[in-house]
Amino acid sequence: MVLPTAPEPPTLLGYHRILSSSAGVRVSPLCLGTMSFGNGWKGVMGECDQATSFNMLDTFYESGGNFIDVANFYQGGDSERWVGEWMAQRQNRDEIVLSTKYTMGYTMFGPQKIKSNYQGNHTKSLRLSVKASLQKLQTDYIDLLYVHMWDFTTSVEEVMRSLNHLVANGKVLYLGVSDTPAWLVVKCNAFARANGLTPFSVYQGHWSCAFRDFERDILPMCESEGMGLAPWGVLGRGQFRSAEDFSREGRKMGPQDEKHRRLGEKLDQMAQQKNTKATSIAQAYVMHKAPYVFPVIGGRKVEHLKENIEALGLVLSEEEIREIDDAEPFDVGFPMNFLFETPTQSYRTNMTSKDIWQLSCNTRLETVPKQQPIEPFQGAKYFGSASK
């Protein structure tokens, strides 16, 4: 007997992927960021009321998305509360892969008189934060819990033992880390593996064609550690526009610097050739550079979310990736520039030992290529279905 194939997803967002080689949970290729959902920060970020937030969540979910990112700190807790209310009303909690974070001072505007232990990486902060997050999210478990940032006061041993306790008790399924130096992540994972504890499976941080620091240590570290990548800031936070377009009225996170102007012109040029948007090129860029990349896409407008979903079908050639790389100089720094760069060769993330010029003196080495990312439409082609 042959079982029927699952129905065709409504969009490319419904072709799910493995989160990382160390985390087998299935997630949509985009992660919906919810930092704008709430009233707590509307004076800074602009208004995104509950109806608008629910509309964004509904659009994402109905399009096949199941990967949603929140944090205890966002909007004074509104983001977690609203996502929790939405899941309760839609009765879809177990369909969602939900990530949240701890470490930030989430009680900043709370009634507590002494707030020193409501932040940090330590065990008490973790216990208080997770207890509060579970209540706000109206759930009894968190799929993916991130260390939001490293506090440089709590030991590796305390962090990993405390996190593993939550996993062992079923309150957390997978562990992630955000905004933390690569050497610390490797140290944490080495301690976890040596002691039978749960290591980090995902890294979240700032990465875009304008901010490529990720490519120095974080990206190689994730490849080596078997970790997925959930980059934020991929779309340039409204900065990836031509100078003319940026000068028009609209919400801006700040003035456009020269780097973003140059990249905006390059992305806009490519977008016109492909009949798409500059932000779509920016999204495709990071998803073409490494496997297990799940951009955290936020915002307040459904039409922008739909553009992000459509961009999953955008194909960039290796030459186009190089054009974007070369549009703005990037210094990978020592030792990678010493090992891989020459007057005629710039560092690329897909380089292997055959590209180390010092080792080519004695032999012409053949090496296995690095693992490649999933190609756009790969699932649709395999199952013989047309994209939507």
Swiss-Prot record:
Enzyme class name: oxidoreductase
Matches recorded under InterPro entries: AKR_Detox_Biosynth, NADP_OxRdtase_dom, NADP_OxRdtase_dom_sf
Coiled-coil annotated spans: none
Pfam families according to UniProt: Aldo_ket_red (PF00248)
Protein name (database record): Norsolorinic acid reductase
Record keywords: NADP, Oxidoreductase
Active site residues of this protein: 74
Domain of life of the native organism: Eukaryota
Signal peptide region: none
SUPFAM superfamilies in the cross-refs: NAD(P)-linked oxidoreductase
Family: Belongs to the aldo/keto reductase family. Aldo/keto reductase 2 subfamily.
GO molecular function: oxidoreductase activity
Family annotation (PANTHER family): NADH-SPECIFIC METHYLGLYOXAL REDUCTASE-RELATED, NADP-DEPENDENT OXIDOREDUCTASE DOMAIN-CONTAINING PROTEIN-RELATED
Enzyme Commission designation: 1.1.1.-
GO biological process: aflatoxin biosynthetic process
Gene3D superfamilies: NADP-dependent oxidoreductase domain
Binding site for NADP(+): 233-243
Biological or metabolic pathway of the protein: Mycotoxin biosynthesis; aflatoxin biosynthesis
